[in-house]
Amino acid sequence: MIFLFQEWTELILRWFHVIAGIAWIGSSFYFIALDLSLKQNKGLPDKAHGEAWQVHGGGFYHLVKYLVAPSKLPSELTWFKWEAYATWVSGFALLALIYYAGAELYMIDIVKYDLEKYEAVIISLLGIIFGWVIYDFICRISLKTNVYVLICSIFILITVMSWVYSEIFSYRGAFMQVGTVLGTIMVANVLMIIIPGQKKVVASLIANETPDPIHGAIAKQRSLHNNYLTLPVIFIMISNHYPLIYATKYSWVIISIILIIGALIRHFFNIKHTRANPPYWVCFPIIILASVIFYISDLGKPQLTKIKNTASLIELIPKETLVSAKEIIVSKCSMCHAREPMWENMKNAPKLVNLESSADIINNIQSIHKQSVLSYAMPPGNISFLEENERNLINQLYLSVHNLKNK
């Protein structure tokens, strides 16, 4: 019953998180596109900054933007904030349910630091808080300085945090921790900067005072940051399905490169929304950077002894070697990957992959190879301490099966 409750809770939270994220990202992208497409035509209302005409769903829309505020406040205002809050709350709930509750599987790597669960959770929470505090401090002191200095400072901050996490947590835990920090920065921008600034403007209008334009300038800065951080955060969200991305020694470098690629993609669309010529030149650095990711994802895999893969299965893997490989997999993986898992509160093997017999292992050797030889994804956090020489034996088995199938 506990297992059933956990499964459904996780599923519902994931679904809610995705729905809220779509709503938040959709509205964010829409308003960035709207803002960049505004035209300062003749006949605009007093204090209006620009307007846009749009057609959708069989109707026409006339939108007018006021840079600070209109002369008279309308009776009803629609606030775009709950989407962001719901995304963060559901995301943090997932973090707690999966990564904090199962820290020994998803966060702790005993080879790096043999942390207690509570220690891993505290480090994670402190990292989330300090990530926002340092970012906010950089933005506040850089508001009137060169924008490129600000961008470089934020990039260095995230890169350093990525490296630090990769040295402390498991590869999967470190990757998701960076995503949590970025997501928290984005939501905190809405909760603590953008919305309070807009409320101050509304309060000034109600009091018949002239709103301070600084609130709009700060909100625009933070909104632009959110715009450029969105794609990297989405990438990190879906990355745990691809161990070659998150479970290699240079995964922290991959995050840094993804930050640049995501920013270039958003820059392309931001310029396109202004109706200027799209900057197609961004395709070249994107292709180059993607190639670098492809290369270092292979470079950071476990280092194994090179084996000639021309021999037949029998020549390459003697019976005793096959038995040894099976013994390694059964002893290091089958506490979870079994028809009756021994791991607490685990009813079925992950993805229903059982690794108890020789037939089980041979049938799943490609997945085993990807998770434990091409990356450090399994065992999670290396909780059963799979050594390099043991990964090498698994690699030998994989090569034997591969060669036999391709004869």
Residue ranges with predicted function:
Residues K72, W79, F92, Y99, ...:
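Aromatic- and Gly/Pro-enriched helix-to-coil junctions and flexible linker segments
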Residues M1-W24, L143-M186:
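Long, highly hydrophobic alpha-helical transmembrane signal-anchor segments
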Residues S28-A69:
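Membrane-interface amphipathic/juxtamembrane segments adjacent to transmembrane helices
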Residues W79, A84-A103, S162-M176, L229-T248:
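Alpha-helical transmembrane segments and their membrane-interface junctions
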Residues W15-L44, V181-G197:
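Hydrophobic alpha-helical membrane-embedded segments
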Residues K144-I151, A247-S251, K272-I287:
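Membrane-interfacial entry segments at the cytosolic side of transmembrane helices
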Residues L67-F92, Q198, P213-P232:
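Loop-to-transmembrane boundary segments
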Residues M1-L11, A101-E116, S166-V178, H241-A247, ...:
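Membrane-interface interhelical loops and short amphipathic "cap" helices
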